Amino acid sequence: MNQTLIICSTLNVNSQQKSKAKNSMKNTFHSNELSSIEQRQKYQKHLKKDKKTAEDITGVGNCSPPWRLISSVLFVVCLLLMAVAMVMTIFTTRLSSERSSSNIHQEGLHHPCPENWVWFRCSCYYFSKEKLVWRESQRACLSFNSSLIRMNKEEMDFFSLKSFFWVGVYYDETSKQWLWDDHSVLPSGMFSGLESSPKNFCASYKSKEAYLAENCSTKLMYICKK
């Protein structure tokens, strides 16, 4: 009888253990299944979130058509090109001006004029410090391989002097007119303020507004040109 009870007890225990094991397996399987479902739900939520983000980005892009971006880029490029063109123009102008100034400076430094002569417009000029009568002034210029200046309008505009100088103009009593010292007629309008004068009168020059008819025996400084 006791053995029968022991066997029954053992069977009951085994049965309970098996039942617990089954329940444990069921719970574990159920737990795993729930965990798998939760992971799927999280993954689906993540996909939906990514999809929504992508849609948002696409939506923003749709609000700004590609041609607007292209036009903005082209506008910036045009501004840059204009700036570069302006800089190049300024640089070229400045370089040209510097070269021109350099050429003028070099031309002044390397002019072919003798010492104490002035270079202007491809000619050399000598302004004397000594005073001579008109005929002696003429001979002095000839000794320098030059002549008393026969002025043109450009020289009259350029030379504005502090004193009166002899120039190559004299009054010819025979023809009753003022002539260059080579006996040629003055151009129209040159020294037009000089009036008819008696014999032995020559022209002295200070500026285009100041020139005189003076006795050729007067001693003045003189201007030579070659």
Swiss-Prot record:
GO MF: carbohydrate binding; identical protein binding; protein phosphatase binding; signaling receptor activity; transmembrane signaling receptor activity
Spans through the membrane? 73-93
Task: Name the principal localization, coarsely classed.
Answer: membrane
Specify the protein name.
Killer cell lectin-like receptor subfamily E member 1
Extracellular compartment residues: 94-226
Q: Provide the assembly information.
A: Heterodimer; with KLRI1 or KLRI2.
Q: What membrane topology was assigned to this protein in its record?
A: Single-pass type II membrane protein
Matching entries from SMART domains are given as: CLECT
> What job does this protein perform?
Lectin-like receptor for natural killer (NK) cells. Can either inhibit or activate NK cell cytotoxic activity, depending on its binding partner. Heterodimer formation with KLRI1 mediates NK cell inhibition whereas heterodimer formation with KLRI2 mediates NK cell activation. Plays a role in allogeneic recognition by the immune system.
Q: Could you tell me the gene encoding this protein? A: Klre1
Q: What Pfam families does UniProt report for this protein, alphabetically?
A: Lectin_C
Instruction: Identify the InterPro entries for this entry.
Output: C-type_lectin-like, C-type_lectin-like/link_sf, CTDL_fold, NKG2/CD94_NK_receptors, NKR-like_CTLD
Query: According to the entry, what is the taxonomic lineage of the organism?
Result: Eukaryota, Metazoa, Chordata, Craniata, Vertebrata
Tissue spec: Expressed in natural killer (NK) cells.
Q: List the disulfide bonds.
A: 113-124, 141-224, 202-216
Q: Where is the C-type lectin domain?
A: 120-225
Q: Where on this protein are sugars attached? A: 145
Topological domains on the Cytoplasmic side lie at 1-72
Gene Ontology cellular component annotations, sorted alphabetically: cell surface; external side of plasma membrane; plasma membrane
Q: Which GO terms describe its biological process?
A: natural killer cell activation; natural killer cell mediated cytotoxicity; negative regulation of natural killer cell chemotaxis; negative regulation of natural killer cell mediated cytotoxicity directed against tumor cell target; positive regulation of natural killer cell mediated cytotoxicity; positive regulation of type II interferon production; stimulatory C-type lectin receptor signaling pathway
User: Which keywords fit this entry according to its UniProt record?
Assistant: Cell membrane, Disulfide bond, Glycoprotein, Lectin, Membrane, Receptor, Signal-anchor, Transmembrane, Transmembrane helix
